[in-house]
Curated annotation (Swiss-Prot):
Example GO molecular function: nucleic acid binding
Family: Belongs to the XseA family.
Self-association and partners: Heterooligomer composed of large and small subunits.
Primary localization class, coarse: cytoplasm
Name listed for the protein in its UniProt record: Exodeoxyribonuclease 7 large subunit
Catalytic activity entry: Exonucleolytic cleavage in either 5'- to 3'- or 3'- to 5'-direction to yield nucleoside 5'-phosphates
GO BP annotations, alphabetical order: DNA catabolic process
EC number(s) on file: 3.1.11.6
Annotated gene: xseA
Record's function text: Bidirectionally degrades single-stranded DNA into large acid-insoluble oligonucleotides, which are then degraded further into small acid-soluble oligonucleotides.
Location(s) in or outside the cell: Cytoplasm
Entry keywords, A to Z: Cytoplasm, Exonuclease, Hydrolase, Nuclease
GO cellular component: cytoplasm; exodeoxyribonuclease VII complex
Species of provenance: Rickettsia africae (strain ESF-5)
Length: 444
């Protein structure tokens, strides 16, 4: 009893604030930065943009607070029941005497939740067109190959070995972590880093590689920032993540997808021996074609020589004919000149005799006068015949002559002509004109 009293008297006294701060210091100093795995429950997002929820496992519960700047960095929606791994610092909240985890990073861990997030992200990025870019062809025989992967492990060794085995070339390694919270950012920065190098140091193709693993292990390669870096890369990218059955979002944004890291090395460079054999085959084909081409042109030269000899003979023959023609012309020219001089002299004599010219013109005038007289007589007879014909036709059309042939003209009382039964039906008085006179008839 006395001991209890003494202990009570010697126990240190704290205020509520002091004990709350003391507990806060103990939590923050002893636990520091931790990771906790559990299931989200009781999720609430305040108007301030901060998220409050519990992380539970069976009956145990850990209160969590995700501040707005951290929540904005999370690229998938939070839901109750989602399994996650949270990184952060333990602290206590004096307002209700509880401890809580201040979230610094949050990653999904349950397969169902991760697949849901993956499908939602894939649909959104596909809608943006990040998976439909124009693929850059992988260059043939690149002089520099960039490799982004972990510096440790079998992957980098397999890639280096395969490239050196097939076609040795310069390899530039950009070491990154291929798993973990910041892995996606590191790989994206490596892609951007290669693209920003000076042209002389820039690789011609980039291999992004990692060995196989679970969906959690490969999750960094589904990171949105990494997909955008692959899409924006001006250097062609070969993605080689996991095994052949493993697919990540970087595979859809890369210029070529390799089923394994070793296959990526094979896509990057050809086999030296096969290439050498191919070159030798091409060399043989080139030599054979060159030989045939030379023989073909040699035969053409022979044919051209034959044609040249024939043309020379033909030209010489034609030249001989031309010479003979020239000689004949020279011989005939004096005779031709003499003949033309004779014609000129004869023409001159005819021109100086006016009597002959007058007689010729008189005879020509006589012929023309006779032709004109005959033509005028023929034209006059033709006009007289047409006049007589038209007079006869005109006389036959005179209605007096028609009346003489027994016809009559019937008029109504008002003098209107009645040319049919219908027009005469309503008339009572008719005037009928004959060739020798006119009578009036009244209808009874």
């Amino acid at each position: 009893m006395l001991d209890n009293f003494i202990a009570h008297q010697t126990t240190k006294e704290f205020s509520v604030s002091e004990i709350s701060n003391k507990i806060k210091e103990l939590l923050e100093n002893n636990f520091g930065y931790i990771k906790v795995k559990g299931e989200i429950s009781g999720l609430k997002i305040a108007n301030s943009g901060h998220a409050y929820f519990n992380l539970k496992e069976n009956t145990a519960i850990l209160a969590c607070t995700c501040w707005r700047p951290i929540l904005a960095k999370i690229k998938f929606p939070l839901n109750d029941g989602m399994e996650v791994v949270i990184s952060g610092k333990l602290s206590s909240y004096a307002g209700n005497s509880r401890y809580q985890l201040s979230v610094d990073n949050l990653q999904p861990t349950g397969l169902g939740a991760m697949l849901q997030i993956l499908n939602e992200r894939k649909a959104r990025l596909e809608k943006e067109g990040l998976f439909n870019k124009i693929r850059i062809p992988i260059p043939f025989l690149p002089d520099k190959i960039g490799v982004i992967t972990s510096i440790t492990g079998a992957v980098i060794k397999d890639i280096i070995h395969r490239i050196r085995e097939r076609f040795p070339t310069r390899i530039i390694i950009w070491p990154v972590s291929v798993q973990g919270e910041n892995s996606g950012n590191e790989i994206a920065e490596a892609i951007e880093g290669f693209n920003n190098l000076e042209e002389v140091n820039k690789p011609r193709v980039i291999i992004v590689a990692r060995g196989g693993g679970s969906i959690e292990d490969l999750w960094s390669f589904n990171d949105e920032i990494l997909v955008r870096a692959a899409y924006n890369s001006k250097i062609p990218i070969i993605s080689a993540v996991g095994h052949e059955v493993d697919y990540t979002l970087i595979d859809l944004a890369a210029d070529k997808r390799a089923p394994t890291p070793t296959a990526a090395a094979e896509f990057a460079v050809p086999v030296h021996s096969i290439l050498n054999n191919t070159l030798q085959s091409y060399e043989k084909i080139l030599l054979n074609n060159t030989s045939r081409l030379i023989k073909y042109h040699e035969q053409n030269i022979v044919n051209y020589n034959k044609i040249h000899r024939y043309l020379s003979h033909y030209i010489n023959h034609r030249q001989q004919l031309l010479d003979e023609t020239g000689f004949n012309l020279l011989d005939a020219l004096p005779c031709f000149i003499e003949l033309q001089e004779t014609k000129i002299k004869s023409f001159s004599k005819e021109r100086v005799n006016p009597a002959k010219i007058i007689n010729y013109k008189t005879l020509e005038l006589t012929h023309q006068t006779a032709y004109l007289s005959k033509s005028a007589n023929n034209t006059l007879k033709n006009f007289e015949y047409k006049l007589e014909l038209n007079s006869t036709l005109l006389a036959s059309l005179d209605y007096h002559n028609v009346l003489k042939r027994g016809f009559a003209i019937v008029k109504g009382e008002t003098g209107n002509f009645l040319s049919s039964k219908i027009t005469a039906a309503n008339e009572k008085i008719f005037n009928i004109k004959f060739s020798d006179g006119e009578i009036k008839v009244v209808r009874a």
